Every structure is written in structure tokens, then in C-alpha cells.
Amino acid sequence: VPAREALLYRAMGPKRRKKSSEKLRRGRRPSEGLAFVARDAWGAVTGTVRLWDVVLGEGGPAALLLGPLAVDPTIKNAGIGSALMRHAIAEAARLGHAAILLVGDAPYYERFGFSAEKTGSLAMPGPYERHRLLALELVEGALAEARGTLRAAGRKLKAQRLPLAA
């Protein structure tokens, strides 16, 4: 969605493409039913969050990777991010997912139940700040045996076939 990409660029800048989380999202579709946008009264995209299927370690349990969460910088602190987070977590639970992970600021995400407590045996595929790898169990004990590096899973994007010029 071009409007979502424009919002992500405004909110996060071009460096977002270099993050470890992006490696897990690249070439994949969000988890089924877990891509959300907030719109204003005129239909403009004001916020977005998506969740992506991942596997925790080699042959480990399935989980979701949340992100990026972005809100139009001109209307931050209006509760849009919080509303998107609550909705995303509720939908993930309703769809039967067991855990959500993210890389983010603990002081913000703790209000939704995320912490680094359950991520000590997990790693991202690339550089990241360990204290920012946070998790929320939707099913108690879902991360008890989780170990290793997060790996991309889920639906792949279909390659677009471009017509060849003669």
C-alpha cells in the first residue's frame, strides 16, 4: 500500500530498511489477518502496524514478529499507536497465536505486557540491542523452550513478472 509506505518513511526514515527486523520481513507477507492501518476522517493513513510469522530457532515454535508500529509524526500522542497495539494483540490472540516478539523501546511496550524476560535465549538475525528484544506470551509458557535465532516463516511475496521489451 503506497500510503502505508509513505507513512513509514515519514515516521521512521530510510534507515528502517537496514534493521534486523526488516531481514525477517523482506520478501514475506504479513501474517494472515494481521495488517492494520488507522485512518483519519478523510481516509488518510495515520498509523500502521503489521505482524509477521517467524519461527524461534531451528525447528522451534512459531510466533509473530510485530512491526513496525508507526504513527504520523504530526499527530503523535493522540493514542493511535496504543489503539493499534491493543487491536493487534487482541486479533493475534483471537487467531490462536501463542506469542508476539518485537524490537523496541521497553518503556513504551511494557504497558501492553511486553518484556525482555522471556527473550534471553533468543536472538535476531543481525545486529540489534539485546535489551530491546521484547516478548509477550499470549499463551502461558509459549516461550519456555524457545531458543535460537528468529527465522522468517509464512507466506512469501509473489515475484512480479515484468514484460520484456523487444
What are these regions (language model features)?
Residues 1-23, 29-30, 35-45, 59, ...:
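Short amphipathic alpha-helix that is part of the acyltransferase structural core
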Residues 44, 58-59, 72-83, 95, ...:
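Conserved glycine-rich acetyl-CoA-binding loop
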Residues 116-148:
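A contiguous, mid-protein "functional segment" used to position or interact
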Residues 35-39, 43-55, 62-70:
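Conserved beta-strand in the GNAT
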Residues 66, 71, 77-90, 101-102:
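Conserved acetyl-CoA-binding loop-helix of GNAT-fold acetyltransferases
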Residues 94-98, 103-129:
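Conserved active-site alpha-helix within GNAT-family acetyltransferase domains
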